[in-house]
């Protein structure tokens, strides 16, 4: 029955598969794959005979797509008559499908031999298609679409420029120490800045320099190294981007080294030779600096690039191949690309370490030392090195001596402290009451602005955001376990206001510049007072005002002394319960957390002038503060440090980040030296 059963035209006795390629006796032509049929038709139109049937023709020749014989027509890599670009279909044929040969255009993919670092290239390239030609910088034409993307429209809430208290910055004390410190500038003018940069600054609607910019611009333009401490949100990014971009516009690109022996001199160069390198600790921060660099390099020959871990390395490599003059990177991914031979540091003129204390605290010192001292980067005397951060404790300053030469130390305002634009409130809340108090605060303040909530653990971030969603508050979360795509999407929804509540771990605490954050809530207080400074600095930026609320209980008594000092410095109200807990004697001196350095003294003074001094007493030994607190300087006097009990990663030398010293995974990794 099955032998005779037919359904429509389908028979159970007949195979529904295509017949196998026939032999010569069958008289049928060999099977030709679909992607080769058009090529065969083109060959027949040129008068070429089809491949003869039989076993020898079972596999038609592939044009450059196999390890076998090359096609019979000329122009291949063996006899190298010419090098035609790939066909329009993206296949491996070096001849267009219309059968007509196309002459090789050396400018088709950029300037051969100069694709990596932009040297000597006269072709339009860069974030705004500007050019460097005949020793002159020729800006590209305006692009309204790109301008809207980079600078936004007037009164665009996603593009923050200056706030209502910005003029008060003129009253902030500034301390600059070093030999022959240049005079500050009071406006964006030429000199010292390039005219094209000034036009981009005007597009960004920046009217006057911030205090850190007033000093950093002439210091860097005069070729000096710089260590700058400025309160968070005070324009540190512009403080280093403005002078290095201005110098680039005036001086042009550096020549790219000649290809090594055996390398071909045509096509796109695979290794990039940037002239400026900016290192920062987190993916979010390097992305933010890259966006600012694109903004101020608009219509110029300078091409900014960004590389960081957790993202597709292939797309980052393609971006680098298109040209890389200013590179923004995290230390780990940069080391990876150097090992792959895709980036050379031989042309570096400017090395910038942003959030330098965070990078060293997070255990990036081995990678930074390898990048600066172990690769082909020019010697400290042959480059300019700039360090920017909100805090610079003494032991970090001592380490910085290895990277800087004859530097100017710049301290703006109460740095290592907090901005007076931030109203700080400390509430006594037990752990089991935190959710209900948080709901009360959110109901009181509403969602008119952006609210950033900091927690200590990844699990708490997910749990709290789910709780807020169930309470009909639009919330999202970012932490280290989320993919880069998820983190970028969450930040974009938060920035745009579609999701005005963001729950974050410390991954978002350092350096992020998110406009219009009106309220920062420390749901879990950190064990390090510097982390608290970085967290609340996400609001009150660029002269705007903000509110910072901290949930405090006796579990946080390790930071009570530093918290009281911080509130007093910023002229904030000190709750009575903080003073009573401090008097109980359990919170004197140090910062625990990652080994504890102690705040002993002002963490923003120039070590060359004020010497070492002792650290704090440390916090409870179980949290790594231990005995001694800060190292207090090697030869400048002051107490040394044992670093704290090793039960929480204090170990030896607590002033170097405790358990995370030398550990690339940062403070959340295991407490070991590797």
Swiss-Prot record:
It is found in: Cytoplasm. Keywords: ATP-binding, Cytoplasm, Helicase, Hydrolase, Initiation factor, Nucleotide-binding, Protein biosynthesis, RNA-binding. Pfam families: DEAD (PF00270), Helicase_C (PF00271). A motif (Q motif) lies at residues 186-214. Residues 421-582 form the Helicase C-terminal domain. GO terms for molecular function: ATP binding; ATP hydrolysis activity; eukaryotic initiation factor 4G binding; G-quadruplex DNA binding; G-quadruplex RNA binding; mRNA binding; RNA helicase activity; RNA strand annealing activity. Residues 217-410 form the Helicase ATP-binding domain. The keyword Kinase does not apply. SUPFAM superfamilies: P-loop containing nucleoside triphosphate hydrolases (SSF52540). One of its GO terms (cellular component) is cytoplasmic stress granule. The keyword Methyltransferase does not apply. Belongs to the DEAD box helicase family. DDX3/DED1 subfamily. The Q motif is unique to and characteristic of the DEAD box family of RNA helicases and controls ATP binding and hydrolysis. ATP-binding RNA helicase involved in translation initiation. Remodels RNA in response to ADP and ATP concentrations by facilitating disruption, but also formation of RNA duplexes. This is ATP-dependent RNA helicase ded1. It comes from Aspergillus terreus (strain NIH 2624 / FGSC A1156).
